[in-house]
Amino acid sequence: MADFLLSSVSKTYKPGLFKKPVQAVNDLSLNVSHGTVYGLVGPNGAGKSTTIRLLLGLIRPDSGSILFSGKLLKESTVQSEIGYLPENPYLYDHLTLAELLNFCGQTSALSISDTHERGQVLMAKLNLLEVQKRPLRTFSKGMLQRAGICFALLHDPSVVILDEPMSGLDPIGRKMVFDLIVELKQQGKTIFFCSHILNDVERLCDQIGLMNNGRLIKQFEREVFLQNIGKTVFLHTSILDESQQLNIQSLGGSIRREGEGHLLAIPDGNYYPVNSYLEESAIKILGCRSEWMSLEDLFIQSVKESGQ
């Protein structure tokens, strides 16, 4: 079952009478399965934050539909079931952390005892117990980030949306947040997050979406993703016609124009069928090399192929 199902969603911002409209999301379709960790990555301006606002119901799509747990988003009680950490959380800095969490508990209709117990557990996990009586204005960027995560999780939501959760964190803070996300996953919660730290996405996610220019250009289940990283063979070939390009892509290779020919990127497991096709088609190979491809490499390659 999908917690979120987006079908052909588009959103355009119209900044003013004399300014050009900006299409932030363009024909976006994605499926966030229940109990999974979904990582959405893309360059600045790709449409990730707009996608999150659409998921939260903070803005309405111009076209398309968004379902939450099988219901249209506008008909669901999404706010009570989601915990949200924005990229730059604004917290009432005159409050202490304990006061902030008490306020969150009241707005979430939690009892005083549940608020206290839940707050103590979260602060302990994120190493904030000793500073809970300090005003938030005295917190560092990393401490505020961890405080924002406590705020987002206090009401024990079934779905957690995190926009750049590792932002401003030192290595120890990143480890604490990483472990907490793993724990939430083990509890069966659905987690959707955007991050520029691709190593964390690579290690955490069951599903990964690559976004550029408002479009979802690639989407992987973890098993498929693992088949696309690791050792990759790069073949520089002569010019390929459209039919040859389609055949190579169907065999698991990706293609881009380079120099006087094309550059093929082929995951190690797909090398032999692609190479056999090249031989059968008498396609000239001009050069060959192999590299270890990470998610970062795959991301950069996909953005280039999508036309950025």
Where are these regions (language model features)?
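Conserved ABC transporter NBD signature motif
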Residues: 64-80
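Short, charged/small-residue-rich alpha-helical element at the C-terminal edge
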Residues: 231-305
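Conserved ABC ATPase "signature" region
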Residues: 102, 106, 113-131
